[in-house]
Amino acid sequence: MKVSLFVTCLIDLFYTNVGKATVELLERLGCEIDFPEAQTCCGQPAYNSGYIKDAKEAMKQMMRAFADADYVVTPSGSCAAMLKEYPHIFRGDPEWEEEAKRLAAKTYELTQFLVNVLRVEDVGASLPGRATYHTSCHMTRLLGEKEVPLRLLEHVKGLELVPLPNAHQCCGFGGTFSVKMGPISEQMVDEKIEHIEEVKADYLIGADCGCLMNIGGRIGRVGKPIRVMHIAEVLNHRN
C-alpha cells in the first residue's frame, strides 16, 4: 500500500523524530512511503488569523502536491482536520471544489489510518512505565476521534495507561490563542500539568505536536520529571 506522508510544519521544524517514527512505523506495517516535496503548510495558521487569501494559496499548493496520492497520512489531528475542511472552504469554486473533496476524502490522521484502514491495533510496541493521554481539541471536536488512539496505546506492552482527569479540556495552546491570550493560556496549561501529576504519570502522550509543544515547554520550565511523547514515537518504540 502506497502512503503519501504529510509531515506538517511543527514536525518539519521542531519534531523531526515524530516524522521519522511515523515513517518507520508505517514501513514496518508494510506501507510504501512517498514524500511529495512540493507539500507546504496546510494553511491553518493563516486561515485562523483571517488571512484567507494567503491561506487559500497554501491550500491550493497542498492539493497540487497530493493530487496523485492514494492515501494522505499525517501524525496530526489538527492538520488532518484542516485538510478535511477544504471542501467547505472551496465550496462553489469551479476550479478547486472537486480537488478539495478528493484530498479530504483520502486524508487520514495516523492513528485513524492504522485502525480504520490497515485494521491494526497491536503494532508490536513496548514501553515500560505509567502514562496518560492528552486528547487534543481538534482531534475530538473536528475529527470526532476519541477512542482509536487509546485502543492502540492499550496494546503497548509494559505501558500502564491511566485516565487523565478533564482529559478533553484544552491545554491552552489553541494556535494563536496562546499568543493572543498568554496569561489565560498559561493558567490552562498549568491546570493540565496538575492533572498529569495527579495520576503520577511518567509519560504524557498526545497526537498533536502543538499541544505537546505547549505542555512539554511548560513542564520543562517548571522542572517536572514527566516525559512528553507523540503517539507515533510510542507506537514505534521497541525495547
Curated annotation (Swiss-Prot):
The organism's place on the tree of life at top rank: Bacteria
Gene Ontology cellular component terms for the protein in this record: cytosol
GO terms classed as biological process: lactate metabolic process
Pfam families: CCG
InterPro entries: Cys_rich_dom (IPR004017), LutA (IPR022822)
Molecular function (Gene Ontology), one example: oxidoreductase activity
HAMAP family for the chain: LutA
Family in the record: Belongs to the LutA/YkgE family.
Function: Is involved in L-lactate degradation and allows cells to grow with lactate as the sole carbon source.
Protein name, as recorded: Lactate utilization protein A
Species name: Geobacillus thermodenitrificans (strain NG80-2)
Name of the gene encoding the protein in the UniProt record: lutA
